[in-house]
């Protein structure tokens, strides 16, 4: 899968239960559109969406499950329960929060990575800082993504792409670095790849019409 996404675009097709497009059928159609536009892979949330997208596109999938727990701020594939659910799908890679925050039930991120690898799948580390990226490489993750920059209280807070973190990771770790988070234009995508990103994930700017519409209406205010 890593060979497939190298230098190419990954599109995140997600709509949570409180969003207008929440539907596995709709996400499948969105993924078909992304494929027709040239996406090399899809990042998808939830077993039903993953199964639907795999069926209709046959593209490689990065699977996640977003689930909230009372005893942790981590919600992207937080525990072994979510990993086990994802391993029952045909997703080629599983992404999980690899920040330094405490996991639900006191679980250990290394155990999750080992479980993913034991089933022959790849593991992506969603991180927010350089330190977390370095640790992710030590833990055996196959790639690292800037997904959570700005989403942890101790990481750089910004409304734009964290190109600084991307550059630091590219210089420091040997595993592929994926740029993800707040990429809103083709120019930002190209800049990420020019700075050394192995691949990049674009989500809301392509697949969330309410977010796209708001960018237009905000300019009128």
UniProtKB/Swiss-Prot annotation:
EC number: 5.1.3.9
GO molecular function, one term: N-acylglucosamine-6-phosphate 2-epimerase activity
Gene Ontology process terms (BP): carbohydrate metabolic process; N-acetylmannosamine catabolic process; N-acetylneuraminate catabolic process
Name listed for the protein in its UniProt record: Putative N-acetylmannosamine-6-phosphate 2-epimerase
Known function: Converts N-acetylmannosamine-6-phosphate (ManNAc-6-P) to N-acetylglucosamine-6-phosphate (GlcNAc-6-P).
NCBIfam families: PRK01130.1 (NF002231)
Matching Pfam families: NanE
An annotated GO cellular component: cytosol
Source species, domain of life: Bacteria
Family: Belongs to the NanE family.
Catalytic activity: an N-acyl-D-glucosamine 6-phosphate = an N-acyl-D-mannosamine 6-phosphate
Pathway of action: Amino-sugar metabolism; N-acetylneuraminate degradation; D-fructose 6-phosphate from N-acetylneuraminate: step 3/5
């Amino acid at each position: 899968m890593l060979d497939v996404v190298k230098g190419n675009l990954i599109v995140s097709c997600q709509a949570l239960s409180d969003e207008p497009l929440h539907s596995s059928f709709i996400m499948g159609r969105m993924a078909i559109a992304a494929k027709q536009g040239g996406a090399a892979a899809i990042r998808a949330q939830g077993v039903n969406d993953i199964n639907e997208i795999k069926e209709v596109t046959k593209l490689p999938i990065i699977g996640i499950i977003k689930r909230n727990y009372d005893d942790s701020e981590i919600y992207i594939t937080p525990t072994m329960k979510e990993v086990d659910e994802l391993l029952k799908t045909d997703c080629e890679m599983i992404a999980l929060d690899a920040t330094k925050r405490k996991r639900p039930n006191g679980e250990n991120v290394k155990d999750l990575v080992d479980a993913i690898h034991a089933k022959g799948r790849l593991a992506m580390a969603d991180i927010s800082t350089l330190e977390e990226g370095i640790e992710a490489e030590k833990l055996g993750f196959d790639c690292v993504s800037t997904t959570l920059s700005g989403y942890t209280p101790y990481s750089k807070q910004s409304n734009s792409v964290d190109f600084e973190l991307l550059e630091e990771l590219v210089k420091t770790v040997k595993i592929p670095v994926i740029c993800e988070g707040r990429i809103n234009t083709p120019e930002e995508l190209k800049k990420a790849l020019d700075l050394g990103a192995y691949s990049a994930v674009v989500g809301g700017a392509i697949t969330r019409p309410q977010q796209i519409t708001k960018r237009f209406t905000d300019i009128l205010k």
